[in-house]
Amino acid sequence: MKNVGFIGWRGMVGSVLMDRMSQENDFENLNPVFFTTSQAGQKAPVFGGKDAGDLKSAFDIEELKKLDIIVTCQGGDYTNEVYPKLKATGWDGYWVDAASALRMKDDAIIVLDPVNQHVISEGLKKGIKTFVGGNCTVSLMLMAIGGLFEKDLVEWISVATYQAASGAGAKNMRELLSQMGLLEQAVSSELKDPASSILDIERKVTAKMRADNFPTDNFGAALGGSLIPWIDKLLPETGQTKEEWKGYAETNKILGLSDNPIPVDGLCVRIGALRCHSQAFTIKLKKDLPLEEIEQIIASHNEWVKVIPNDKEITLRELTPAKVTGTLSVPVGRLRKLAMGPEYLAAFTVGDQLLWGAAEPVRRILKQLVA
């Protein structure tokens, strides 16, 4: 049974990973060792009924060297500090990472097994030892419309994202909720009075959002009652943000198409959802296909994608973050041909940023490695 070290298991993604591994009884097939950046020597948690002893220091290279597999959700700074030191010792175990630091390295594979199991299997045969979870929007896009890529039907795709606060971290989620609460408090008495002017209410809310003391330390701007059309840093040579660049770079790496890439681009926008990312796609298909056939191709790709009929009532019920949060379901709806021509397709999808967007691909590659 393989010795598997877990780092960053207390954080948001790590906690979701622990929950999913417990639900699927994954701890039965491995010996867990838990690491910490600040509390070495304290009692380790118990998952799957296994006593893992005491917490070990996440910076102790000698302890890390003893492991067959390391799973880290600690973030890119930790990876950048520890990974090269560990590899320099000759350690030859598997490194599984939820952070972005190693994604584009030649000796790393971005994992999303319902989409790129062929790439993963080939990498394992070649002796690849580094496996990294992908960008959340990219993974959720490929889970949603992977069938179109699998059938080589996509000429190009333009994406507009509607990304949840969770993608920016736990502090950002708290800030969003604080903003929402303050906006309601600013007009709570007026909301109770049906005779109050909605324009007066709007003016008060807007003034509150613009106030110097409105909490924006994490997002840098109001998100509650607003949106932020910018995620990550600017890439000056293209005008893209790094999040937008990932759509192209990671999609093609996941699919094994880096030598013959499919153009993927668009705009990434932060909205006031808590943990589900939504995306609107404009897709140029390589050929005109009947909509019914397109729906069948999408729906049959994996067991989690679900085609939602282009009907208002069903869409409002099934195709929202409120519905999808906390589930592995990846619904795709608003499917229709666009006025630009019969080979142009519109689609809209929603997916949980912490599940298929982060923890689940990591859980599933770990399951393969311990098998």
Curated annotation (Swiss-Prot):
Keywords: Amino-acid biosynthesis, Diaminopimelate biosynthesis, Lysine biosynthesis, Methionine biosynthesis, NADP, Oxidoreductase, Threonine biosynthesis. One of its GO terms (biological process) is isoleucine biosynthetic process. Phosphate binds at R103, K246. Pathway: Amino-acid biosynthesis; L-lysine biosynthesis via DAP pathway; (S)-tetrahydrodipicolinate from L-aspartate: step 2/4; Amino-acid biosynthesis; L-methionine biosynthesis via de novo pathway; L-homoserine from L-aspartate: step 2/3; Amino-acid biosynthesis; L-threonine biosynthesis; L-threonine from L-aspartate: step 2/5. It catalyses: L-aspartate 4-semialdehyde + phosphate + NADP(+) = 4-phospho-L-aspartate + NADPH + H(+). It is an enzyme of class 1 (oxidoreductase). GO terms for molecular function: aspartate-semialdehyde dehydrogenase activity; NAD binding; NADP binding; protein dimerization activity. Changing R103L: 7-fold increase in affinity for ASA, 150-fold decrease in affinity for phosphate, and 1400-fold decrease in activity. Changing E243D: No change in affinity for ASA and 82-fold decrease in activity. Substrate binds at Q163, E243, R270. SUPFAM superfamilies: Glyceraldehyde-3-phosphate dehydrogenase-like, C-terminal domain, NAD(P)-binding Rossmann-fold domains. It holds the Pfam family Semialdhyde_dhC. The active site is at C136, H277. SMART domains: Semialdhyde_dh. Its EC number is 1.2.1.11. NADP(+) binds at R10, G11, M12, V13, T37, S38, Q74, S166, Q353. Catalyzes the NADPH-dependent formation of L-aspartate-semialdehyde (L-ASA) by the reductive dephosphorylation of L-aspartyl-4-phosphate. Homodimer. Belongs to the aspartate-semialdehyde dehydrogenase family. Consists of two domains, an N-terminal nucleotide-binding domain and a C-terminal dimerization domain. This is Aspartate-semialdehyde dehydrogenase. It comes from Haemophilus influenzae (strain ATCC 51907 / DSM 11121 / KW20 / Rd). The gene is asd.
